[in-house]
């Protein structure tokens, strides 16, 4: 019998993202939309330490098996009309990363996408992505975002999802 392992995370509100650096999106531990297998635990599997939603580790999903997985993500940025014209971004990016905090095997990014923001006054820039990837126990996954505005920008909302199957014993 095939068993699905699914972790579906959503941000609890806006996060300020600094300019010109990839930032690991953090997800609250109490607001999981779906995580029955505890792939997004507050108690970190590598250290046993419990972290809060403000810790960068709140952005990690910890697969528990070697598997071929499906990743999905969504980002929604603020409307750039909120920024002076000289401070606006020319592009936003997002990517998936194995070990984004260099805890185990080293930073390994994949599926980087680069997009122009929507014109000012037409709403926030929203992008989705999916990507298949091999996952391994002990190697966390993360979803990172980037912009090139002159000032920090609001990531209004984000989601990060991982799913894979295992043969049940």
Give each language-model segment a name:
Residues 1-169:
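Extracellular jelly-roll beta-sandwich "head" domains, especially the C-terminal globular C1q domain
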């Amino acid at each position: 019998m095939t068993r699905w392992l699914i972790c579906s995370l959503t941000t609890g509100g806006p996060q300020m993202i600094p300019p010109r650096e990839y930032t690991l999106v953090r997800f609250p531990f109490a607001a999981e939309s779906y995580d029955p297998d505890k792939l997004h635990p507050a108690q970190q599997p590598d250290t046993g330490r419990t972290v809060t939603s403000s810790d960068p580790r709140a952005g990690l999903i910890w697969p528990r098996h070697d598997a071929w997985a499906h990743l999905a993500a969504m980002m929604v940025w603020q409307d750039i009309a909120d920024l002076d014209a000289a401070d606006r971004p020319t592009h936003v990016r997002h990517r998936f990363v194995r070990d984004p905090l260099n805890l185990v095997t080293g930073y390994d990014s994949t599926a980087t996408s680069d997009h122009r923001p929507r014109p000012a006054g037409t709403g926030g820039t929203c992008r989705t992505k999916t990507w298949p990837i091999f996952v391994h126990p002990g190697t966390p996954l993360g979803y990172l975002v980037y912009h090139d505005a002159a000032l920090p920008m609001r990531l209004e909302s984000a989601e990060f999802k991982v799913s894979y199957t295992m043969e049940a014993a």
